[in-house]
Amino acid sequence: MADDGGPFPLSSSLLHASSSTTILESSSSSLLATSSPAIAATFSSFSGRPSSYLPPPPLPPPAPSTMVGWIGWVFSFVFQVIPSILYWAITFCTITLPTWLFTLFSMSLTFTMNFTTLLLIALAIVSTVSWFIRYRFLNMYSRLPPEPQRKEPQLDLFPDVQEGDSKPGLANYLDEFLSAIKVFGYLERPVFHELTRTMQTRKLIAGETLLLEEEKGFCLVVDGLVQIFVKSIRDGKSPADHELNLAGDDSTDEEGQNVDGRQGYQLLTEVKNGASMSSLFSILSLFTEDIQLRTSESLSSSVSSVGPNLARVPDSSPSSPRGLVHSPVPVREPSESGHNLPTNGEFLPTVPPLHLEESRGTPDHDHQPESRTRPGKKRRKSVHPDIVARAMVDTTIAIIPASAFRRLTRVYPRATAHIVQVILTRLQRVTFATAHSYLGLTNEVLGIEKQMTKFTTYDLPNDMRGAALDRLKDKFIKERDRLGHEEVTKGIALHNPSAGRRRRSSSFLRKEAALQARMATTPRRPTATGSQENMSFHDRDAAGVSPGDLLSTIQLSRFGPRYEHLAPKIYSPLAEKEQSPFRPPTMRGPASPFHRKESLDEDALFRESILDCIMKALGLTSSTRDILRKSSHNSGDASPKLLSYDSRRQKAVFSNNAFGFIDPYEGSVDGETESMMSMSVTSAGGTSPIVNLREELRNDIEIVYFPQGSVLVEQGERHPGLYYVIDGFLDVGMPACDKGDDLVGATRPAHGEEAFPTLKRTTTASSRTSSVAPGGSDSKRRRQSRKSLYLIKPGGIQGYVGSVASYRSYTDVLAKTDVYVGFLPRASLERIAERYPIALLTLAKRLTSLLPRLLLHIDFALEWVQVNAGQVIYHQGDESDAIYLVLNGRLRSVLEGTDGKMNVVGEYGQGESVGELEVMTESTRPATLHAIRDTELAKFPRSLFNSLAQEHPGITIQVSKLIAQRMRDLVERPMTEKGAEHGAGSIKTATSTVNLRTVSILPVTAGVPVVEFGHRLLNALHQIGVTNGVTSLNQAAILNHLGRHAFTKMGKLKLSQYLADLEEKYGMVLYIADTNVNSPWTQTCITQADCILLVGLAESTPSIGEYERFLLGMKTTSRKELVLLHADRYCPPGLTRRWLKNRVWINGGHHHIQMGFRLTAEPSHPQTKRFGTVLKERVQVIQAEIQKYTSRRIHQTALYSAQTPFKGDFHRLARRLCGRSVGLVLGGGGARGIAQVGVIKALEEAGIPIDIIGGTSIGAFNGALYARDADVVPMYGRAKKFAGRMGSMWRFALDLTYPTVSYTTGHEFNRGIFKTFGDSQIEDFWLEFYCNTTNISKSRPEYHSSGYVWRYVRASMTLAGLIPPICDEGSMLLDGGYIDNLTVPHMKGLGADVIFAVDVGSIDDNTPQGYGDSLSGFWATINRWNPFSSVPNPPTLSEIQARLAYVSSFENLEQAKTTPGCLYMRPPIDPYGTLDFGKFDEIYQVGYKYGKEYLEKLKNEGTLPLREETEEKKKLQRTLAPRRASI
């Protein structure tokens, strides 16, 4: 085998070998592998078979049938078949395959071609690669998965199961009765049984009449229909005779004297099942029959005498206390029965005679003024004068007699006070607010307050005038000269050294109350012969110090000897009674020697004298106390505990409890089980003077000086407290423009404030409430157009009705002169009413005695209606029979289309009205109205309007203004607009975010930190300043106030009253669902919400959580918004779409919030880290520290970071909920839009937050850049990069195409926008964003707030002819500027309060043309190039087409400039063209400079919406500041 002589000798030798041996075949194969192809061919010829032939692997023998055969077969398979297979595989890999490869690579090919062929081949390759890059790599934007715009959810009206009488028999009877007595509020079991145990039922047949003036009790309809008629007073008198005289003229005729047969009756209202036939005022009359209008013993001492009239009293008169009582003071002494009070031009017989003689217990009446009794005067004992009821069908009525109310007042005084407080609240919400704000009956309403002064005027003692008052004034004069005008205008308070005593904790007060309650069980109470000498030292000290103590001790020699014999004679008749903290000063014994040093202080003497006068004005004397004290021990735990809601509020001026000072929610539900807190307070409550109230309130009185022109109380705000006038005059008036213009719900809040005084919201920064400083120009303008109503003289009290009943002020109160007042904050009044409900009963008595006849009839006809969540009030097409005023809750008006779709027309919150247009025009209902949640309504029937229109035509003028305003709104915003189809959604209308009162925070699933989220949102709402404040509720807060029975069936009504109280008290209430999904509190949070915030963790799974399933099961129609919490300020593309994909019920939008949170708690024993991990972290820390000093990059926080004050995410959400969002609208204009980047930077530096962004064309591009990161730094970089691409002409040149549709293909334009935004979606933007386009397929504008950003920004930037339209769901979209280049109206519809609109559009040449009736194109061309021609150049064809395209846009632009709340900005960018993108820096600086100058101008004018001007600081200017600027 080593022979190399040639192949033949070797081959011949191989012929002698056996060809069947595998060794020779292997050798021949080995030789073939190393020989040439010729040798292989020769070998093939000798062997007679091809060289590639290999023997196939042998087949295994057939399987035997015996056991031995099986063993032989296996042996043969292992030692024969397997080696053959291995041999075949090795041979193929080592011989056959290399042979094939060698043969292939040994071949040679020759191609011959010319240069043209090579060029074509190269061109083909380049084209193929270009096509691949262009349409497969650079065209990625066209292959994104389809993400169409999110369809807004259709509104579903759930079946109305509330209609009709579904419960027959006894169940229906009970339901109607219970619904009728809901007017009393929550009634505990003993109180309910006491009221109903003497109830009587009466059957009326159809047509039977009932004289309600003969029915002395509370009447209600159980089953049937009753019409209420009133006797007409149209007897030839002019309407002016029936107006209330605010000038104080008491010479009026008695009502009802001219009754003759010509007078008929007019229909007031129709009373159906479950409604009351009695008015609120008549109910108050039933409760207050035994209450005095004015206390008599208030004049029983010279210290509390009636001021100047005492100068006419002889010296001998004080020897008898009774002589001083009946001193002739006809001006101060009111009518005994109240019949001679001027009420609407006539005397009002509305209440039964007040037997004050019996209550006073004085037999001698010869000292009464002559005006007490009028000869021939007819005294009516009815609380329903001139009211007749007629049954339309067979009717069953129930009557609770007056005796039941009298007994209830005696047995349960605190429960009575609670009922009176509820009725007073509803009286203000229903009757007074409707008469004042809706019907324009301001004179009638304010006349009650004016005439209330004759009950509340008590002069200071004579000793407090003269030299003492001069010394007091000197202190203020010195301080006034030291302070500036601005500080003095806020008021100067006299320093109170004892003010620190007020700040004792409530727990200490409760302990003290409980201790004194145990000490009060001494045998002193039943003694009848007690005297001052028998009092212990502790009792003397507890009795408190009064001005009388000063006079009876060391001051006697100073003021004269006449007081030495006065004190014992006055004290002796009352010696047998228990000593009262409100006893007149001279009725007390000698004071404790420990108080003598303090009695020298004249300031303390002033304070105590003022407190005495205020208490007498409130009706707090020993005699009035004894009226309710008879059965105080019987009014045990069954009566509600009279506690204020928040005992920590020392800032009385900020409390606005709707139920005033009586909180009926501290007691238990069933009256049998009590919580420990309630029990501890029970001992301090009631009418027993356990804690010395005088001692507590003495330090709360503040003496304040207001210079002339200062504002003490503003119209629409809650009274901060009582102002007692020491010296000077207070002018009570109202803005002249408000008379007749303050319409309830006259327009959407975009046109002004809500009209009900219960909701005074700041609509814009330039509104009336934006500046409270009296020295401001706004205040001066208000004073000039102000109408003065009446003056409050020294000794009078301002704010009595508003403070005690917790009403809002209908008037402004200014200082007519330099005025010195004593101020008692409302928190102190709460403590008074806690222990002495007589204060509320006295107020109720006085109100009923002063009620005008007109208001009585309105009160009779107005019906208080309570509807459940989801209940339909009326359907589309129903007959219009009443106007509805929203007292509490929220309504939604829905328009049902012919195709079954429902579009939201509007939403109505607290204080708004609905339905007046169709009622006055007697047309059918244009839409369906349903309650979003549990709602209280005031039903104003059409019959009442007809009755008022006949007797008081002035009311028709007022309502006519309302109808005209509503018609104007319909013209500007038609009800059938298609906004639900192509706008921002079916729920996101202009009214959906306005007037939200309750917001629920609901987690998507368990584990979401809703409590921390709620606290942060609450802090943000406090900082931006919500009108009337904001509070939050969780289950713990509810249980603390209502006890463990808060969520039982018995406690449901109590809970609803408590929540309604909070809604009236605060501008917004947050409900935090911090319990499990099936808890009653979670259900309460859902049913009470105007808006529900579904909070979820963005990084968690977007599946539907258990709370959402529970929410869907509740079938609520409230507005629902999604809040996604992010750990970092970044949202990955497509994340929001995954959350919204399956949540079709999210109808209010979504919000991205950055909030640091921890999903899992830290382990108590942290795990030890590995050495490598620790070393890596340490190196990273060191590296970061080194880069701080070596890196050239400037490290700074973004301008729009979450930590920036007033610009964080929670503040943005808070402004959204309050309807105070700041919108930014960017117009289109090509390269001129670069100036918008500079304007946005100027807004950032000015500290103005931006919440919503909308744009058109280049404005859509810039707005999307800013909305993506909410930061101007990345926006600047991306905008400059895009401008560089747009400035390159080569890109457009390479994108040119045959101009059938456009000059370019649009690819380069698409590519530039896609490189900027990528696959981001509008839902992922950090700020809310939209852009508008023009749909030329359907000839309408469209607004896009979801989908891929690049597509709709590209569509909004599409210029016709230059770029082809973009296709979207079959429609072609073009530049939105063709229809509306500045979308301010749409931004306003999204709820933005202040809108910055930046217009960068081109200005067309408006030069007058005069080329004649015909035009030669040759002449026009020559004239264009002729420098000496004076004829203006005619527009070209392209210019004419462009102007034609923008015709509608110009009209919308002019409308946008005049939109309320819009701040129009136009930088000086006219010299720049549409395609001047190469001048980026120059145009940017122009916009930045203009923005700085414009905002500085707004700041100097005071119209810039600065973050410092919040409601809380406005209140501080007038309330807390005077306390600080003290002497």
Swiss-Prot record:
InterPro entries per UniProt: Acyl_Trfase/lysoPLipase, cNMP-bd_dom, cNMP-bd_dom_sf, NTE, NTE1_P-loop_dom, PNPLA_dom, RmlC-like_jellyroll
GO cellular component: endoplasmic reticulum membrane
Transmembrane segments: 70-90, 113-133
Signal peptide residues on this chain, from the entry's feature table: none
Biased amino acid composition, Basic and acidic residues: 355-373
SUPFAM superfamilies xref list: cAMP-binding domain-like, FabD/lysophospholipase-like
Location of the motif DGA/G: 1375-1377
Activation/inhibition comment: Inhibited by organophosphorus esters.
Keywords: Endoplasmic reticulum, Hydrolase, Lipid degradation, Lipid metabolism, Membrane, Repeat, Transmembrane, Transmembrane helix
Region (Disordered), start-end ranges: 240-259, 299-387, 576-596, 750-785
GO molecular function, one term: lysophospholipase activity
Domain (PNPLA) ranges: 1224-1388
Membrane topology, Cytoplasmic segments: 1-69, 134-1527
Enzyme class, UniProt record, top EC level: hydrolase
Localization (cell): Endoplasmic reticulum membrane
Active site positions, chain numbering: 1257 (nucleophile), 1375 (proton acceptor)
Function: Intracellular phospholipase B that catalyzes the double deacylation of phosphatidylcholine (PC) to glycerophosphocholine (GroPCho). Plays an important role in membrane lipid homeostasis. Responsible for the rapid PC turnover in response to inositol, elevated temperatures, or when choline is present in the growth medium.
Family: Belongs to the NTE family.
Name listed for the protein in its UniProt record: Lysophospholipase nte1
